């Protein structure tokens, strides 16, 4: 099997980042979340981060044998409690790369990236319905810290349209610039 290489994403990767972002909703979602909104928001965030040049915001492309097989977006954020830490905003692999070690290698990079910056913690968010990802994270040593509950309160399902720009952080996290 060909070795896996990681490289920084460039503007030439915009299309492949959009395709990989679509994988982030390849499981049962809450009724108020639309797959295209998730893919659009995450691909926009990755494309912007790749173009920013911010050293505390990195987007990587994983390649094997010249083919793109995954991506990672990791950044430094400050949580609600004031703790600056690493945060995996996006990790995605192609369907063909599932179970081949690509995601594990990307997570190893995220951990190393976080440690190199002297940050004490690495966090991520995952939808409750993404059982495969949750098992992967737990096997990698991640533990549940907080559970977010949501409830629709009117007949109109929530949407991100008209409610500000979606971003890759949870509401209690802000990127560090």
What residue ranges belong to the model's regions?
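Conserved beta-strand in the GNAT
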Residues: 61, 67-76, 92
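Conserved active-site alpha-helix within GNAT-family acetyltransferase domains
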Residues: 104, 116, 128-146, 151
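A short, internal acetyl-CoA/4′-phosphopantetheine-binding micro-motif in the GNAT/acyltransferase core
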Residues: 88-98
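Conserved GNAT-fold acetyl-CoA-binding loop/helix
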Residues: 25-48
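Conserved N-terminal entry element of GNAT/NAT acetyltransferase domains
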Residues: 1-12, 154-155
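Conserved GNAT acetyl-CoA-binding A-motif
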Residues: 107, 114-125
